[in-house]
Regions:
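Basic, polyanion-binding surface patches
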Residues: 1-187
């Protein structure tokens, strides 16, 4: 018999994404969000869910754009800092020593040191409740060449992304267990 855990947002794992925006004055800001994912393949889209109280929320509404910078595990402390400190009062880039880079496609910055970047224009804003879902159409994905495989796709073992868990901890991604759309054919 399974135990009822109640109606809660305790999905076992979510990606750790760093959302990049500019404020009204053009100051670059980043915020870590663990509520995000892919939501459409045509047009290619991702979503991030943010509370209205965040500085990033207002920046996205104002600028209609954001980036997703995917940190590797060696940047876990910086990614956590980006999520626990407001950009209203501090310059997160200055404090962490990381570098804001201007996107050439959207009105938002990304983190130069992070190996994978997704550049998005806001396609739709969905008010749900405490959180608002920002759906961003992907304009481009940029990656450092050292995290790509032979097919020119991100290699998760080279990328070393961070995942967030329901018990409020960060984790590394483990080894692959099989090829998608293939291992099921063995049944």
């Amino acid at each position: 018999m399974k135990n009822s855990l109640g109606a809660k947002t305790i999905v076992p794992t979510t990606p750790v994404w760093v959302v990049g925006t500019y404020d009204r004055e053009g100051k670059p800001n980043v915020m870590t969000a663990a509520w995000g994912g892919v939501c459409c393949s045509q047009p290619p889209c991702v979503y991030v869910s943010l509370r209205k109280a965040t500085y990033t929320y207002g920046n996205i509404v104002e600028r209609k754009a954001f980036t997703i910078s995917i940190p590797s595990e060696n940047y876990a402390k910086e990614a956590d800092y980006f999520g626990i400190t407001s950009g209203k009062t501090v310059d997160k880039f200055k404090i962490t020593g990381l570098t804001p880079m201007k996107s050439d496609l959207v009105d938002a910055p990304y983190v130069k040191e992070f190996p994978l970047i997704i550049e998005c224009k806001v396609l739709k804003i969905v008010e749900i409740g405490l959180h608002t879902e920002f759906i961003g159409e992907i304009m481009d994905v940029k990656a450092d060449s050292n995290v790509l495989n032979e097919q020119n796709l991100p290699d998760i073992e080279k990328l070393k992304p961070i995942i967030w868990t329901a018990d409020m901890t960060y984790h590394k991604v483990g080894k692959g267990i099989g090829q998608a759309f293939s291992i099921g054919k063995e049944i």
